[in-house]
Every structure is written in C-alpha cells, then in structure tokens.
Regions:
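A structural signal for multi-pass alpha-helical bundles of membrane permease subunits
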Residues: 25-293
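Short, Lys/Arg-rich, polar N-terminal cytosolic tail immediately upstream
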Residues: 1-21
C-alpha cells in the first residue's frame, strides 16, 4: 500500500540580482539623501551667487539658476587691488603643498621611530606627545608668534609653513599603522642587510600609500582653510593666503557680494575636486591605522 505524502509548498524563485528592500533600509536611504541635500545647499548657494549680480543677490525674488551667468564677477575679483586674489591663491597653494609633503615625511619618521626603534623612554615620549593633543591650538599662537618673531620670520613664507610641519596626531596615525605592519617583511629586509633607514625607505614607506593619502588629504584641506595663523604672520598683503583675502571683503565699507562669492567658489573648488577624487583613501587610511569607531 502506497503512503501518500503531503504536497510540498514551493515558493516562487526570486530573480537573481534582485533583493527585497526592507522598510528600515528605505528609511535610511531617504534620511541619508536628505542629509546629502542639506550639506550640498551651501555649495549650491556659493556657486549660484558667484554668477549673480549684487541686486539679484539682495532681491527678495528667489533665483534658482543664474541665467544669464555673470562671468564678469571673475574679472572684478582679480582686478581688485585691495584684495589680491591671485597672490592669495599662490600663497595658499605653496603653503598647503609644502606642509602636506613635509608633514607626511616628518610624521612617518616619528611614527616609525615610536613603533620600531626601542629605547628606554619610548612610552614616556609617546604619552607626552599624546598629552599635547589636549592643548587647544589657539593657546599656542602667542608663544609661537613670539618665537617666530624673534627669528625674523614674520611676513615670510617660512613663517607661514614651518610651524605647520609638525603634527602629533599624524605621528600617532603612522605609529598605529606601523605597529600592525607584519614583521616578516622587516625580518627579510634585515637578512638582506638593511638598517633602520633602509627598512623605512624600501619596505615600510612604499606600503604606506593608504595612510599617506588619507593624511595628505586631511592636511591639505586644513592648510588651505587655515585663517588665524596666516592672518597673524602675514601682516603684508604680499603674504596673504586666500582665506585672509576673502576676509577683506567683509571688512570693507561696502561689501561686493558677487566678488565675495566668486572668491569663495574659487577657494572651495580645488578642495571639492581633491576630496571627490581621493575620498576613499580617507576610509582606507584610517582603517589601516587601527582607528575604528
């Protein structure tokens, strides 16, 4: 006698490559999209106002797009002798590039020494460096200015650059990265006769591209946006950076809003391009250094 088997309930096969969106996922996408739009609004206003006239900016009538765009604002910006925009861009580029390259080199050396070269007071030195992170940077401006002034570096390019070459947090990032670096590669280098400098140059440094790109991006943005220190050191318009030049528009008796927004657009455009091109290195570098939320 045959035994009857109950029918097996079958579910329709879901097409490959299609996933069912959960309500929580949809809500997350909506919230993130709204936040993205919120953060993009200031950039939209900057670039929109840069191509409008003064009456159009001050008008109560809202203008979504600058039609027609007024590119003469760009000419007015660079022809203003009281606000040397070309000089500010040149000085900002020089300061940001030199500080970025120099800070990466110095911080990588310091991090390598703290992670790989043993000596008696290494931990004491490391924790003393970490304590300096608790001191606000603005507190050090007065003694730092006195030091820079005593050696004659006021109104000089080196006065703008050298104090920003040393960064405790950057050295900390490199130290954490080198602590997690496999020792097998260094042992192989020692077998080949490499000393500490050789290990750093030929093994560790070439494998530090991720952390170098992340730190370089952060350093470049910070140097480019620096305002207070260039304002203190650059007492002559010959040494003004782009942020100091933009501040002169706000201290004038009549504010040229189109020129101000055009200058802000020019100042922010390199940062937007660099950040979009290299944003993935921030995550890779911070993750490689062992700092996770």
């Amino acid at each position: 006698m045959a035994v009857a088997t109950p029918p097996v309930e079958t579910r329709p096969v879901r097409p490959a490559g299609r996933s069912r969106l959960r309500p929580g996922t949809v809500i997350s996408y909506i919230v993130l999209s709204l936040l993205a739009i919120l953060f993009l609004v200031p950039y939209y206003l900057i670039f929109r106002n840069a191509l409008l006239t003064q009456p159009e900016i001050l008008s109560f009538k809202w203008v979504w797009l600058p039609i027609p765009p007024h590119f003469e604002n760009l000419q007015a910006l660079f022809s203003d002798e009281a606000a040397p925009m070309a000089t500010g861009l040149r000085n900002s580029a020089a300061v940001a590039i030199i500080q970025t390259v120099g800070q990466i080199f110095i911080a990588s050396l310091a991090g390598y020494g703290l992670a790989r070269i043993p000596y008696r007071w290494s931990n004491v030195v490391f924790y003393a460096m970490l304590l300096t992170l608790m001191i606000p940077g603005a507190v050090t401006f007065v003694p730092l200015f006195v030091l820079v002034s005593s050696i004659g570096w006021v109104n000089t390019l080196q006065g703008l650059i050298v104090p920003g070459l040393f960064n405790t947090f950057a050295a900390f990032l490199f130290r954490q990265f080198y602590l997690d670096f496999p020792m097998d590669l260094e042992d192989a280098g020692r077998v080949d006769g490499l000393n500490y400098w050789g290990l750093y140059r030929y093994i560790l440094l070439p494998n530090s591209l991720g952390i170098m790109m992340a730190l370089g991006l952060i350093t470049f943005i910070g140097s480019w946006n620096s305002f207070l220190w260039p304002l203190i050191i650059g007492q002559s318009d010959r040494w003004w950076t782009v942020q100091v030049v933009l501040s002169t528009f706000l201290t004038a008796q009549t504010i040229n809003l189109p020129a101000l927004f055009m200058g802000a657009a020019i100042a922010v455009l390199p940062l937007v391009i660099i950040f979009i091109a290299a944003q993935r290195y921030i995550v890779e570098g911070v993750t490689a250094s062992g700092i996770k939320g």
